[in-house]
Amino acid sequence: MVILYAILAIIVILAAVLLINAAITSAKARKLEGNHPTFTDEELKTYAETFSRMLQCATVSVKDTHDDTEFAKLRAVVEEAFPLLHQKAQRQLLAEDCWMYKIPGKDTSRNILLMSHHDVVPAETEGWDYEPFSGAIVDGKVYGRGAADTKGSLCAILFAAEEMLRAGITPPVNLYIVSSHNEELGGDGMAATLEYCQKNGITFEVILDEGGAIVEPPLAGMNCEMCSMVAVHEKGRLKLKCTVKNESSHVSLTAFKGNPVERMSQFIQEITTKNIFIRRLHPETRGLFTGLAPYCKLPMKLLLSNLWLFGGLLTKVLPKLNATAGGMGGTTCNFQTIEGSVNSKECTASVMLRNVNEEDLKADVAAFKAVAEEYGITLETERDEYYAPADMASPAYAYPMDCLAKVFPRFPAAPYILPAGTDAWRLTPVCNCVLRFAPTRMSKQQLGSIHAENENLDISAIAEAAAFYKYLVRNYK
């Protein structure tokens, strides 16, 4: 009986601790109240018309070539719409059409960078309610390829700079604005930017690029309308070529069974069904959960407020929710191609490993290699890129998060790991705090329209994003 009472006491104490932690989490959290930026009809009309003109420029980037026709058209639109920026900022083109503006600040020894890209992916007319490059303005929205990815944030950045110059505001530090012309291809625009910065000794305290946005709550049952999701890390890429060959006749007693295609298939089956990679609750994911916990309902609030107890469970459960959630826990593996036939003497496959942590990746590759050796498969590295995470302990990270609380007080903000790819990784050698975040508000439909039909943004979302950029720059310390 004593044991039973002891067990019950432990359960009661544990439940009390969990509930107290949840209550403390809520008590310490920022209250979601306050006013968001508002705009006159005339201001919104100006934003809409300029944004529409930018979307009418079909700046589709094409591999291995650059036709400047539509890009030149966009440059002309931007020069006309933002005259003060082009009069007062230092401007140059890198590569064929990567824009770089510099607005000197009061402290010319320090730099911040707002970046975007103005190239877009192709768009077919089929499936669109309006022509993809019409820039149609309908019901408070502007439609067109590139609206969300990422001419919207670029338009907001340019408006912010123009409006500050019109008001006679000098940024506290040097403000750089960079927009690439071939981000969608993984082109040389940002590579040229990095080369220029390194050659001229330019480093940045903080960089803001695309990636995260202001979106509908990522977790069910949250007590908020939208969330500011700030990507502080981008998963690295390791591409391997896997090769298996038929052994020569003098090794016919080999332990390997089956022809190359069979062995490769068995290898892929084992890799994709076994959990051979390290999984953990990374700091970025921990920050995501703790940032959103106060605004969740029970029982989710209880789980996220007590990661000391439930962290391991969440790490195991996340892959079962969806691929994006699962990818936050560690290395993911995606076989992309396989070549060979039953009668061929060899079979090859390419695989992409996306990793969160560089040290974990070393162990993951060793585990991957061990399985490959069981099937006589050799590995060759074709691509190896690791992207350093932003320093979440730095003032450079804390400041934009504080700006989000000031400009969008009704939306919680939290960090996360970006599963997609951006140009921002190229600039990690010149900045310890690269944030993949554009302050554009998007519904699920708008987020899903990226690289798809009916891409659009609200006019007010562009104006709000410009207000955020202005606040961030003019109050920078």
Protein language model features and the residues they cover:
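Short glycine/serine- and small hydrophobic-enriched flexible loop segments
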Residues: 18, 159-166, 266-270, 471-474
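An extended, acidic, His-containing surface patch that forms the Zn2+-binding/catalytic region
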Residues: 92, 107-109, 215-216, 277-345, ...
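Feature marks short, highly hydrophobic, charge-poor N-terminal signal-anchor/signal peptide-like helices
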Residues: 1-9
